[in-house]
């Protein structure tokens, strides 16, 4: 800890595997995947801190950490996240914590003088509620946000703008990536605030375990959604760190859509639930379509690799081995 390796100062990210990389938020869905990916690629100097070890909302602590560690690269995957209920109940917590984390990390990364590149991870919720489909990068700030999570979205938009401002004023190589709906190991399977895919995995597993006759899912199943395995996002993060240096944020999606009905049938098959799948069409469907336009990163040469079914099999295996076994 605290040492700086002497690697080629002109090397690309992938050629600089001894350069110190700070992954902020390494215990979450995204950060843990990035950490796994860096280690598998042979990066030997990855620095992480738990929240107990480093509270990213405390400016003085963050500045002291950067001054001591002098990382060469930063991936900012740390954020305060939660479901619709949490966002609507604690809006001040969400906007304040996320603004503090972003401001402290980006500013300390510039001031410590050692950081060559920083990547900030946002969310597809930054886009207007009625954005064109597929959603291009330039639809940012073109209309009102989805009210249910606007506090989180506004903070993430501020993060993008902060990276842009630091690039314009200081020449700091800070870039931003906006992933679509993610899933995979380390996902949140909580009954009250999990997203649709882990929620379906949990519900079908519980129905299978209790020999339930049916699983009832809200809506008609017709809305179209896009899902990206978190390992593909980790791969895209490494790709952007190595290939991209620009002002505009970059969308990262799978580019393929699936209806909620198709998704539910696939999860049912993967879990091995033998009962009926029932749709409660009296309940709302939500937005009819949500797809990111990821042509920009794909034109640079990046493509996702994990097919949805393969990713679901792996995610269900992780759920059984880590979430279910932990309850026994």
Curated annotation (Swiss-Prot):
Site (Important for catalytic activity) at 123, 125
EC number(s)? 1.1.1.271
Residues binding substrate, per UniProt? 203, 218, 225, 285
What UniProt keywords are attached to this protein's entry? Isomerase, Multifunctional enzyme, NADP, Oxidoreductase
Site for Lowers pKa of active site Tyr, residues: 156
Q: Which Gene3D superfamilies does UniProt cross-reference here?
A: NAD(P)-binding Rossmann-like Domain, UDP-galactose 4-epimerase, domain 1
Q: Output the CDD domains linked to this UniProt entry.
A: GDP_FS_SDR_e
- Active site per database record: 152
Regarding protein family, the annotation reads: Belongs to the NAD(P)-dependent epimerase/dehydratase family. Fucose synthase subfamily.
Q: How does it assemble?
A: Homodimer.
**What name does UniProt use for this protein?**
Probable GDP-L-fucose synthase 1
**Species annotation:** Oryza sativa subsp. japonica
